[in-house]
Amino acid sequence: MNEKITPWIEGKRVLLLGFGREGQSTYHVIKQAGGYACLDIADMASPAQRPDEEARWITGPGYQKCMDDYDVVFKSPGIVLEKPIEEYRCQILSQTEVFFQCFRDQIIGITGTKGKSTVTSLLYHILKNAGMDTMILGNIGIPALDHMEEVKPDTKIVFELSCHQLEYMTVSPHIGILVNIHEEHLDHYKTMEKYVEAKQRIFRNQKKDDILICNVQCLPESAICPSTLLKAGVNEPDTELCVAEEPDGTWIHFRDKAYRIPVDEIRLLGQHNYFDIGVVYGVCSILGMDDGAFTAGLKTYEPLPHRLQYLGERDGVKYYDDSISTICDTTIQALKTLKDTDTVLIGGMDRGIDYRELIEYLSECQVRHIILMEATGKRIYQEIYKFYPEFKDRPRLILAEHLEDGVRRAMEITRPG
């Protein structure tokens, strides 16, 4: 591993910008490699315990002011730079950038507003189940540099990429998957254009022989996609990868292949998850996997928590956790999937997105009780009463003080069955 990281740090003054999970991982990797002139740390908050008395610590609101005092800065995802990256004299890197520079030809990169973790974990599980040498890294919670020494020449690296990891990337994966793009993280990016630009970095630096599988809902202009583009969609016949609802089941059509999803034998629910399965099927087909091996992996996959997760039944009422749904589309898809929903709880941190689509759906849907809570719920409640006089059956709306209050009320009013 040392020889992989050494060219980036040897003889240089190195700064870690951010000391969360990834920053701490980067610190240990660089410390082990050695050869740097200095290794310092800058973060808004002071750490509870300093791992190195030799390191200089820069903390507080002005912690970014020192960046140009260093040759190399390793930036943690999510930190907003105070000025455009081209205005810094230092070289700004990330774990993801360095790892991709070393192994990009072996990487299958996945991004999207929603669904990327499901696609990532499902693809990894199916490849692993089929006996392939496979590794899962990235935004799913596993720092990349911790595992550099485990990569072999034939290792398939399944890498989940957030918009924050992609934001300043100068290299793209051999196979890129863009699951979707919806309005989110506007508290960070301020404009939708900036958010889309970050997501599109997954393919911007691909090569001619690389592959991009992209949802037709967020297709890039051909002029900015240098690789082979495979369009994917639901009930979209003019795509290279189509997930289609047909009289005899849900089918995946990819190139010259057709595969029926065994929906009654798997734990992934809903059309949005069938699209995710279709994307994974496309990658597995590209890698030469037969349908039997794909089915074996699909049937043994355990969905990630908080994604239409069945929690159990109490007093005749079934409880589901779909708290990963932080945008309109996924909330609507969840309600469409669970057709007998009697009560839904909606609320959380307000990321500044437009909730009109969700409000219009809630007005028309048959859900008997809509419990709204926290910042998002209160905003939706206020917008309905201020801007939507046509909202149907307003007594369905219940404003709760917080999550605990919302759950208590839901248990009191939800009908068995």
Language-model regions, residue ranges each:
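Short, charged/polar "capping" segments at the starts of alpha-helices
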Residues: A45-P51, K65-C66, I79-P84, C218-A223, ...
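Phosphate-binding loop of NTP-binding sites
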Residues: H28-K31, Q64-Y70, P77-V216, P220-T228, ...
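C-terminal helical cap/extension that packs against the catalytic core
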Residues: R50, E357-P416
